[in-house]
């Protein structure tokens, strides 16, 4: 397959005529292609490039950016949510119609996802069409126009998107949990506050992109593409904004409680304490503890009846319930605890029994076989999460932004094996002794407050 490249200025790029053909070299005739090793490059401007040529018929490229909701402030809340919906708006190089029609014409897909830490712009298509979608990806992320009338027309979608997401009580409780646990940064919701819907302006969108979509805050990850070509694209078109951008405030854990009385017969509740930042040895210990307690059913639509949390609660509660450990790690903090779903009348018994089970482990009642079984579950879950191209792309991109490097699965498994039984017990102790945060919704007449635990 012939590699075609064309140089051009930034102004010419906006005409969508100069991006290099992002195509991989074919294997020699008659020789079955073998996937190559992951190639990793960090440019002087801080931009990270990683690629894996797996010779798959479809390619996937993701641009990961440190621009999640934690980087919003009190004056621009909801900006990242609107950006998430604005990927098809007119840019300096293509109209909204051209972007939508161009992607559709080759059977491709452009998606935007975001967490509290990062935003990810991902394109998927047949490998022969990567150059087409790559140009749209670059336009959307480096040359948005945010025309006033297009932004205004998109505002009602914020309310719909939020309403659909928060139909799930678990999503609502998790959002409230972060708001209760933190005073800033990680307290910011993934969804635009109601009072800001209709008020996010094109100027705010431009400022957010200008301050956060910088080279040092980006990672370009490709699967099914050639590393030299991906590197050339990054050097030529993602070097527009230099510098580190706005660093953002460090998350301040404080603890607190948000209760939402709505009369639902099922009570959803989450109780957590601060844990550890992602990538640390302590975070690995909390991950093992999560699987010691029970991270959820391993059979589709199955029960969680074999977990220690479930068994502990079942001894004293005879109404239907569900309970699992909760674990979330971020770049500078983390949350660990458990999540319960129960009948309103038994909510207090379920929460207290689950809390007492963690206290039991904190007192040293933990066997080595239980720890080994938890490690095996954690390792299996991790390996299965990176088995798909989507999961692998997300893992490489997240690591590239967090650490500027990539830790292969073999090393991750060694880090999990290095967790000692005492480390897991200490993690449980940290939860028990730590300042708690709680969020609950439903008929809360029998749901205890934090100080009642």
UniProtKB/Swiss-Prot annotation:
Q: Where is the transit peptide?
A: 1-14
Query: Where in the sequence is N6-acetyllysine found?
Result: 66, 199, 250
Main localization of the protein? mitochondrion
Q: Which GO terms describe its biological process?
A: proteolysis
Subcellular location as annotated: Mitochondrion inner membrane
Q: Does the keyword Transit peptide apply?
A: yes
**Keywords from the named record:** Acetylation, Electron transport, Membrane, Mitochondrion, Mitochondrion inner membrane, Respiratory chain, Transit peptide, Transport
Q: So which domain of life are we looking at?
A: Eukaryota
- What molecular function does GO assign, one term? metalloendopeptidase activity
Instruction: Show the GO cellular component annotation of the record.
Output: mitochondrial inner membrane; mitochondrion
**Gene3D superfamilies hit by this protein:** Metalloenzyme, LuxS/M16 peptidase-like (3.30.830.10)
What is the membrane topology listed in the Swiss-Prot or TrEMBL record? Peripheral membrane protein
Q: Which family does it belong to?
A: Belongs to the peptidase M16 family. UQCRC2/QCR2 subfamily.
Assembly: Component of the ubiquinol-cytochrome c oxidoreductase (cytochrome b-c1 complex, complex III, CIII), a multisubunit enzyme composed of 11 subunits. The complex is composed of 3 respiratory subunits cytochrome b, cytochrome c1 and Rieske protein UQCRFS1, 2 core protein subunits UQCRC1/QCR1 and UQCRC2/QCR2, and 6 low-molecular weight protein subunits UQCRH/QCR6, UQCRB/QCR7, UQCRQ/QCR8, UQCR10/QCR9, UQCR11/QCR10 and subunit 9, the cleavage product of Rieske protein UQCRFS1.
What is the protein's known function? Component of the ubiquinol-cytochrome c oxidoreductase, a multisubunit transmembrane complex that is part of the mitochondrial electron transport chain which drives oxidative phosphorylation.
What is the protein named?
Cytochrome b-c1 complex subunit 2, mitochondrial
Protein species of origin? Bos taurus
């Amino acid at each position: 397959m012939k590699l075609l490249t064309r140089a051009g200025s930034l102004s010419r790029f906006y005409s969508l005529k100069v991006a290099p053909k992002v195509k991989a070299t074919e294997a020699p005739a008659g020789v079955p292609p073998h996937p190559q090793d992951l190639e990793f490059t960090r440019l002087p401007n801080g931009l990270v490039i990683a690629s894996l040529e797996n010779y798959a018929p479809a390619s996937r490229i993701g641009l990961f950016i440190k621009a999640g909701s934690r980087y919003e402030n009190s004056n621009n809340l909801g900006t990242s949510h609107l950006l998430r919906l604005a990927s098809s708006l007119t840019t300096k190089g293509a109209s909204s119609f051209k972007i939508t029609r161009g992607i559709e014409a080759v059977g491709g897909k452009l998606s935007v996802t975001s967490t509290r830490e990062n935003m990810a712009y991902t394109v998927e298509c047949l490998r022969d069409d990567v150059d087409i979608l790559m140009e749209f990806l670059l336009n959307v992320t480096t040359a948005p126009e945010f025309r006033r009338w297009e932004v205004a027309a998109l505002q009602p979608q914020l309310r719909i998107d939020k309403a659909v997401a928060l139909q799930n009580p678990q999503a609502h409780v998790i959002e409230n949990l972060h708001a209760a646990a933190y005073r800033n940064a990680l307290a910011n919701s993934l969804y635009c506050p109601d009072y800001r819907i209709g008020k996010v302006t094109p100027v705010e969108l431009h400022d957010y992109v200008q301050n956060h979509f910088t080279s040092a805050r980006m990672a370009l990850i490709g699967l099914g593409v050639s590393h030299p070509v991906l590197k050339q694209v990054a050097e030529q078109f993602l070097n527009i904004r230099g510098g580190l951008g706005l660093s953002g405030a460090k998350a301040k854990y404080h603890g607190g409680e948000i209760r939402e009385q709505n009369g639902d017969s099922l009570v959803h509740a989450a109780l957590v304490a601060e844990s550890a930042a992602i990538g640390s040895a302590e975070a690995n210990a909390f991950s093992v503890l999560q699987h010691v307690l029970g991270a959820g059913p391993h059979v589709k639509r199955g029960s969680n009846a074999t977990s220690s949390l479930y068994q502990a609660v079942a001894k004293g509660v005879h109404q239907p319930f569900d309970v699992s450990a909760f674990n979330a790690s971020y770049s500078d903090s983390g949350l660990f605890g458990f999540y319960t779903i129960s009948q309103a009348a038994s909510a207090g018994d379920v929460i207290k029994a689950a809390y007492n089970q963690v206290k039991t482990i904190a007192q040293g009642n933990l066997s080595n076989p239980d720890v080994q079984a938890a490690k095996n579950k954690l390792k299996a879950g991790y390996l299965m999460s990176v088995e798909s191209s989507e999961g692998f792309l997300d893992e490489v991109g997240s690591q590239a932004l967090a650490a500027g490097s990539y830790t292969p699965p073999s090393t991750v498994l060694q880090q999990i094996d290095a967790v000692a039984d005492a480390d897991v017990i200490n993690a449980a102790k940290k939860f028990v002794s730590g300042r708690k945060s709680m969020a609950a919704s439903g008929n809360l007449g029998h749901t205890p407050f934090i100080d009642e635990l």
